[in-house]
Amino acid sequence: MKRNRLSFMNKVLLSSPAVKQPRLGCCSPLSQAHMRAARLDWGSLPHRVVLCVFQYLPLIDRARASSVCRRWNEVFHIPDLWRKFEFELNQSATSYFNSTHPDLIQQIIKKHAAHLQYVSFKVDSSTESAEAACGILSQLVNCSTQTLGLISTAKPSFMTMSKSHFVSALTVLFVNSKSLSSIKIEDTPVDDPSLSILVANNSDTLRRLKMSSCPHVSSDGILCVADHCQGLRELALNYYMLSDELLLALSNETHVNLEHLRIDVVSENPGQIEFHSIKRQSWDALIKHSPGVNVVMYFFLYEEEMETFFKEETPVTHLYFGRSVSKGILGRLSLNCPRLVELVVCANGIQVIDNELICIAEHCKNLTALGLSECEVSCTAFIEFVRLCGRKLTHLSIMEDVLIPDDVCSLDEIHTEVSKYLGRIWFPDVMPVW
C-alpha cells in the first residue's frame, strides 16, 4: 500500500506544473502565479521530509524525483541514502535480473564510495560478471565498508575466474576498510593469506564470517581468524575446516560468546568415505563457554559416508539431511543430540522409521520443528510422535506420501488427531499436480 502511494506521488511529481515550464502566452497571470506558488511549495519541503520519502523509493524513482528541483537533487546525494547498495551484474542474454547501469556504477564510485557501508554484489553464472564485480571491488579504496556480501545467483561464478584477480580485489577492501563487521564470501577462491590480511586490519570489528565452500582456505586459515577475532559471533564453514583446535579457540575465555555456528558437511573429494571426528571434550568446551549457541549442520552425504557422525554426544541444534539417511543414523540422534531443535530429513528410502521418530520425541526435549519427505512413517507412530512433542512443535511439514495408513488410523483421520495435540489446525503437505 505504501509503495502504491509513493509511486502515485512520483507520477504526480513528474507530471506536476512544478516540473513543467509554462509556455508564454498560454496561461493567464493568475494561473502563472498559481504555478509559481506550487513550485515554491515543492522546493520548500524540509530536507528531512524529502529524505524520509526518498528512503522508501527504489533507486530509479529516487533519481527521477531528484530532477524536480535543486533542493531535491541535494537530498538525492545525502550520504544517508548511500550507506547500502547492491551492485547487480549479469549478461543480459542469459540472466533474468537487470544489471546496474555502468554510468551509475561510476557515479557511485566517484561520489559515494566514501559513504558505502553495506555493500553486496549479485552476479549471474558468467565469469564476466564475477570479473566485473571484482573490478568494482578493487576501486572501493576510500570507503568505510562494514558489511560485504558476494552472491552468486546460479553456479558459483567467482570460482571460475582467476584466483589471483579475485584475491587482489578482495585484499584492497580488507586493507582499506578498517571496520568490517560482517562478511559473506561463500563459493569464492579466498585463501589463507587473504584471511591473514583481513585479520590484520579488522580483527577488532569482525562479528560475522560466512565462508562455506571456499576450497582454498585450510583449517589453519580459519583457526587464525578465531584466534585473533575475539568478537566473532557467527561463523559458517565446511566440515573439513572444523577442528578440535578451532572449537577450543572459540571457547577461549577472552572470546565473546558464539551465537551461530553453521557447518556444511559435503564430500570434498569423489569417493571420500571417511571423515575426521571431533572430540566430545571440544564440543563440551564450546557449550560451556557459549551455552546459547545454535549449531547448524547441513549434510549432503550418502549413507556410507556418514559412519563417523553422531557416535558421541553432539550439541547440534538444527540438522538438515539433504540426501538419504539410514535408520541407524536417525537412531543415534535420540541418544546423542539432546539439544536438537529442528530436524529435516529429505529422504530415507522405503524403511519405516516409526521407532526412530518416537525415540527422538522422547529424548530430544527441545524439538520444535520437523520436516519429512520421501520417508515412511505409520499414521499411528506419527500421531504418537506429535503427542509426545505436544504444542511446542511449532513447525511441522510432512508430505502426505510419507504417512502410511494402518489399522488404527487412516489418512482421512490423521489431521484431526494431530490438530488436537498441536492445538491448531494441521494438514499434511500435498505435492501439487500441474
From Swiss-Prot:
Signal peptide span: none
Main localization of the protein described in the UniProt heading: cytoplasm
Ranges occupied by LRR repeats: 140-165, 187-213, 214-239, 242-265, 322-347, 349-374, 375-400
Positions of the F-box domain: 39-85
SMART domains on file: FBOX, LRR_CC
GO biological process: entrainment of circadian clock by photoperiod; protein ubiquitination; rhythmic process
CDD domains listed in its UniProt record: FBXL21_LRR
Tissue: Expressed in the adenohypophysis, hypothalamus (especially in the suprachiasmatic nucleus or nuclei, SCN) and pineal, all neuroendocrine structures associated with timing and homeostasis.
Pathway recorded for this protein: Protein modification; protein ubiquitination
GO cellular component: cytosol; nucleus; SCF ubiquitin ligase complex
Pfam families reported for this sequence: F-box-like (PF12937)
Keywords: Biological rhythms, Cytoplasm, Leucine-rich repeat, Nucleus, Repeat, Ubl conjugation pathway
Subcellular location, record wording: Cytoplasm, Cytosol; Nucleus
Task of the protein: Substrate-recognition component of the SCF(FBXL21) E3 ubiquitin ligase complex involved in circadian rhythm function. Plays a key role in the maintenance of both the speed and the robustness of the circadian clock oscillation. The SCF(FBXL21) complex mainly acts in the cytosol and mediates ubiquitination of CRY proteins (CRY1 and CRY2), leading to CRY proteins stabilization. The SCF(FBXL21) complex counteracts the activity of the SCF(FBXL3) complex and protects CRY proteins from degradation.
Record text on subunit structure and interactions: Part of the SCF (SKP1-CUL1-F-box) E3 ubiquitin-protein ligase complex SCF(FBXL21) composed of CUL1, SKP1, RBX1 and FBXL21. Interacts with CRY2. Interacts with CRY1.
PANTHER family in the record: F-BOX/TPR REPEAT PROTEIN POF3, F-BOX_LRR-REPEAT PROTEIN 21-RELATED
UniProt name for this protein: F-box/LRR-repeat protein 21
Organism: Ovis aries
Taxonomy of the source species: Eukaryota, Metazoa, Chordata, Craniata, Vertebrata
Gene: Fbxl21
